[in-house]
Amino acid sequence: MLEEAYLDLAKTVLTTGHEKTDRTGTGTISLFGYQMRFNLQEGFPLLTTKKVPFGLIKSELLWFLRGDTNIRFLLQHHNHIWDEWAFQRYVDSPEYHGPDMTDFGRRSLVDADFNQRYQAEKKAFCDRIVTDQAFGDHFGDLGLVYGSQWRAWQGHQGETIDQLANVIETLRTHPDSRRMIVSAWNPADVPSMALPPCHTLFQFYVNDGKLSCQLYQRSADIFLGVPFNIASYALLTSLIAKEVGLEVGDFVHTLGDAHIYSNHVEQIKTQLARTPHAAPQLWLNPDKSSIFDYEMSDIKVTGYDPEPAIKAPVAV
């Protein structure tokens, strides 16, 4: 099964990982240095041992591809996975005059009354991002995060570098190049980012008419984040392969700090007790030629028959 690589990762970290503290204060079981490989010829690696919301993966990747850094696009597509980081910037600003939201990530998990206030404040914030242009332009922006680095890296001479477009052109003209790399980790810009990039750098490789991609991910939330990352980069590889006339090869996922949060352990044990199903297939609109032209309706998975979703809190 295509999914076994992920399940093996989870088992390995549970059994051999080290207990560590972390930035969020949640605590983790962590392992440093791990690699998974997914043969994309065998299907699309969207996990089946729990339902993974593919619509959120699609809209986030399209957001990256647009070079966008404002959550308004995500909210318009009912995607809330970046809300907490934008909201954090707002409540830390002098413009916020609502209830005390200090340490809202942890307090919302242990205090039901606070969680009710927090959810109401966050919903009002997200609604205003969409409806109030000036407010949304300011507080919806996450800084120079993924989309900006992929599509508009700022060079030393003030030039703008579209790393992704450059890689696609190199795939067409010099497919054996070892320089087909896109980096989201820009040390000069990290302080301005709401969340420094977890998936930091990816590289493409062509062999026998197939396109493979390797991702280096510095920080890997195994239960919540990694399933998204696997599917997102498999989708990106598939989109680019289609554009340049190649078949898909492997997605290689290299992890730095691979961790399971302490409040995800029971959930991941539940997932590991389940039996994987057959991998779904990816459908891409044959009428689209550029990865920058896709809309939500142009990307679908077929034959997806997952086990039920398993909820878990996000560590902010």
UniProtKB/Swiss-Prot annotation:
InterPro entries: Thymidate_synth/dCMP_Mease, Thymidate_synth/dCMP_Mease_dom, Thymidate_synth/dCMP_Mease_sf, Thymidylate_synthase, Thymidylate_synthase_AS. The keyword Nucleotide-binding does not apply. DUMP binds at R23, R178, R179, R218, S219, A220, D221, N229, H259, I260, Y261. SUPFAM superfamilies: Thymidylate synthase/dCMP hydroxymethylase. CDD domains: TS_Pyrimidine_HMase (cd00351). GO terms for molecular function: thymidylate synthase activity. Catalyzes the reductive methylation of 2'-deoxyuridine-5'-monophosphate (dUMP) to 2'-deoxythymidine-5'-monophosphate (dTMP) while utilizing 5,10-methylenetetrahydrofolate (mTHF) as the methyl donor and reductant in the reaction, yielding dihydrofolate (DHF) as a by-product. This enzymatic reaction provides an intracellular de novo source of dTMP, an essential precursor for DNA biosynthesis. Homodimer. This is Thymidylate synthase. It comes from Levilactobacillus brevis (strain ATCC 367 / BCRC 12310 / CIP 105137 / JCM 1170 / LMG 11437 / NCIMB 947 / NCTC 947).
